[in-house]
Every structure is written in C-alpha cells, then in structure tokens.
Amino acid sequence: MTEATEMKDDPRTYPTRPYLAVSAAIFRGGKVLIVRRGRAPAKGIYTLPGGGVELGETLEQAVIREVREETSLDIEPVELVGFRQAIARDAAGRVERHFVILPFAARYIGGEVSLNEELSEADWRNPSALGALKTTEGLADVVAAAAARLAALRR
C-alpha cells in the first residue's frame, strides 16, 4: 500500500474538526524513547510514541494505552508539557490533516520495546542527540521540557 493510499483510507484525512492526540516523552536512565513512523502520516519521521484519544478516555488513559499498543511498554504519565499543533493543507489550500497533540513527560515502568505495525524503529536516545534526526516539528523542545519537569520533581 502506498502512502497516498494509506492517507486516502484514513478517516482523519480532510477532517471536519481537529483530531486530539497524546504523546509521551518516556525517560529511562537519562535517555528518551524515540520512534520512527512506519506509515502515513509522517512516514519515516522520528517522533514520540502516542496517538488518538478515544471517546470516554482521560488523557492519561489514552497515553498509557497508545504507548502500550505501539511499543509494549508500561509507563507512568507524570504531567503535560505543553501542546503542539500539526495542520497540513493540500495544494488547493484545504485542511488535509489537523492534529492537536498533548505531550506528557513520562517515566518508564517496565517492559521491552516491541513495535506494532505503525512504527518501524525505536531507540533510547540521549536528548542532546536528537538534532541529527529528521523529527516532527518541536520534538526537541518537548523532550527538553519533559526532561526539565521530571528533573524538577526529583529535587
């Protein structure tokens, strides 16, 4: 299946409202888990694990579920660290995608990384090494904010 076909079949394409999503900057031993998208949107781009909030879920429940589905890891979401907006328009200027993403600072609790079909790669990286990767916009800022928040809570 091509990326264009994947996007055409995605109900989040050409939405009537923004799509709410969560992500997690998960830290273990000073490193953060970075994943690479294996399908559209943003195929091949490095980002944080996460996904859509389902009806009736709290944000915390959603991020725990999404991380477990994508990576098999158990996490403790600690606190929201801002928000991100991703709006993509087609050649005619129509909104093709609109995501509002709420990232959490999170602690690793347990498990070994096992990726689902949405991801092609995962790696625990030093936050200072993210600049060499092609990442989603603002990823380094989210990771820095999450690291600072977790460090402040340890004091």
What residues fall within each predicted segment?
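Acidic, metal-coordinating catalytic segment for phosphate/diphosphate chemistry
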Residues: 2-23, 94
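A structural signal for short, well-ordered beta-strand segments
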Residues: 24, 80, 104-106
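Conserved Nudix-box catalytic region and its N-terminal flanking loop in Nudix hydrolases
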Residues: 31-69
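NUDIX/MutT-family hydrolases
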Residues: 114-146
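A generic structural micro-feature
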Residues: 14-18, 45, 94-100, 119
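A short coil-to-beta-strand element that immediately follows conserved catalytic motifs
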Residues: 74-83
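Active-site-adjacent beta-strand/loop module that shapes the phosphate/pyrophosphate-binding cleft
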Residues: 84-112
